[in-house]
Amino acid sequence: QDNLSLLDIGTGSGAIAISLKHARPGWQVAASDLSDDALAVATENAHRHNTNIQFFQADVFRQVSGKYDIIVSNPPYISFEDKEEVGTNVLTSEPHLALFAQEDGYAIYRQIIQGAEEYLTENGKLYFEIGYKQGPMLQEMIGHYFPQKRVRVLKDLFGLDRKVVVDNG
């Protein structure tokens, strides 16, 4: 469809929002982040790529209004206990706010999942990037809050869990 609305939570550099807006120019795309610095980078990137995206500062759903057909998020999902698994180049080049989350990496997912129903349209979909060990737990968590929805865990090219899709099936 060409007239969908999308919210990217935790947009960071804006890569997901910008790519989707390029692929679907008719979509209304909004993107939020907690970090002012990230939003400045995202806004500059959107300007460079001639995309019209509404950027705003928000902590998950605070400051969000309206309903969206699609909510996407690549939130911080690394457990602080798994810090040693993260490459040194990532640790030195990425803000830790963008990498690590409380509750063994599930804190931001939980906030999004608990609040998403209020901001999704009736046929709305959720898309998450996930850590390779998080598929089963997220499937269970999402199933609790969205028993009527289909929850799929998709694998990356290495056969590891990498994305969750929540839809009506």
Task: List where the protein language model places each region.
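Residue-level signal for inorganic ion chemistry
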Residues: 16, 42, 74, 90, ...
